[in-house]
Amino acid sequence: MTTGTPDCLILIAEDNAADLALVREALKEHQVECSLHVSNDGAKAIAFLHALDVDPKAPQLDLVLLDMHLPKRDGEDVLKTLRSTDRYGQTPVIVMTASDSPEAQQTAEKNAALYYFRKPSSLSEFMQLGALVRSVLSPSIGQAESGTGAKKNAGGRK
């Protein structure tokens, strides 16, 4: 399901409805006005990435918000698929997970995730994610609003 404006595109791969609602609220609060494509399992996220990759008219994918514990295909599979595509291999990824295991963080780092975000349990904590998304996308949003500018490399914490 894709919603929003066509100026930028975010893939949200999240199977938890409550967490998805918090992510949406955080994006809204931080005025992130992008098209959102939501996949509630890893297989659907991978199918979406493949569909984008083979369609030369598909929009640019600006960001992926990725839960690592997805049904059918896990977040690591989604991340590896994304990194293997020519067109979207450099797309910024923010990994969202409830896991605090060193292995989960190493997997994210190994696959060049820009940020590793430990999922909190409250809206106020999710607001940090909204601010992070806004900072990653600010060059894209600025380009869409002004018609100029270049994307910068966003520094990350991992």
Model regions and ranges:
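Conserved acidic segment of CheY-like receiver
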Residues: 7-18, 23-27
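C-terminal output helix
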Residues: 121-133
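Active-site residues of response regulator receiver
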Residues: 62, 66-67, 97
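Short, glycine/charged-rich "phosphate-handling" switch motifs in NTP-dependent
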Residues: 114
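Acidic, metal-coordinating helix/loop segments flanking the phosphotransfer/catalytic sites
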Residues: 24, 38-63
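The feature encodes the CheY-like receiver
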Residues: 66, 71, 101
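Residue-level signal for the "D+5" position in two-component response regulator receiver
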Residues: 38, 70-73, 110
